[in-house]
Amino acid sequence: MPIVRAKPTSPGRRFVEKVVHPHLYKGRPFAALLESKSKTGGRNNNGRITTRHIGGGHKQHYRIIDFKRTKDNIPATVERIEYDPNRTAHIALLKYADGERRYIIAAKKQAVGDTVMSGELSPIRPGNCLPLKNIPLGTVIHNIELKIGKGAQMARAAGASVQLLGRDGIYAILRLRSGETRRVHVNCRAVIGEVSNTENNLKSLGKAGASRWRGIRPSVRGVAMNPVDHPHGGGEGRNKGRHPTSPWGQKSKGLKTRNNKRTDSMIIRRRAKKK
């Protein structure tokens, strides 16, 4: 898709770079697959901030996405490709042969009129969903289940993909974009192809207000705070005086915080370190 740079008619327009998607549907979303969505402001049920930098933003409806893809051996036609404010990927509205409609994450190069199927006998085409045991080695996939029947959990963001490297007994071996290699059960399902909207990382919001529309509040540096607010706060000038930490004293910039021994055995090779 073309990338458009706005004319600098104002300071807020000067740095805007947009990815134009002329193929996206311009009408309202399918009402039967919408749910109301309330803002939390990053607070829990006690009213305390549990996630910083969240608040405000435009009102949104949640689109109910079919991550399980369990409607097997019934062909569906892509009615339209839509924008979804809840995720970076685009979504596709499917109309099945029996008349039912469902939203799915749109695959790259998926277009209106394409036929989509789920199940073990589905052809190897972008957007089709199969168990990992039925997918040829070397295939690029997305929307991958980690538990059988739970629904897709991995590789769901715009442009995301995973490569199926091989099979070892009851496990398939996958290589993630991060460089990590891990095992997933061969009966878990995955969708063929990459996720749509691959140029999402090339856009530039251009101004702070565009982040506020998305419900993202400003991030304040720790060294700009007082000692009561952050371990980096206070002092003369801008000295931290210690290893970089979070506001709660947890070391950042390289400290490993993963604590999930239950699935450690599923990871064959950890992701590569940043240089």
UniProtKB/Swiss-Prot annotation:
Record keywords: Ribonucleoprotein, Ribosomal protein, RNA-binding, rRNA-binding
SMART domains: Ribosomal_L2, Ribosomal_L2_C
Any one of the GO CC terms: large ribosomal subunit
SUPFAM superfamilies given in the database record: Nucleic acid-binding proteins, Translation proteins SH3-like domain
GO biological process, one term: cytoplasmic translation
Subunit description: Part of the 50S ribosomal subunit. Forms a bridge to the 30S subunit in the 70S ribosome.
Family: Belongs to the universal ribosomal protein uL2 family.
Name the UniProt record assigns to this protein: Large ribosomal subunit protein uL2
Native source species: Psychrobacter arcticus (strain DSM 17307 / VKM B-2377 / 273-4)
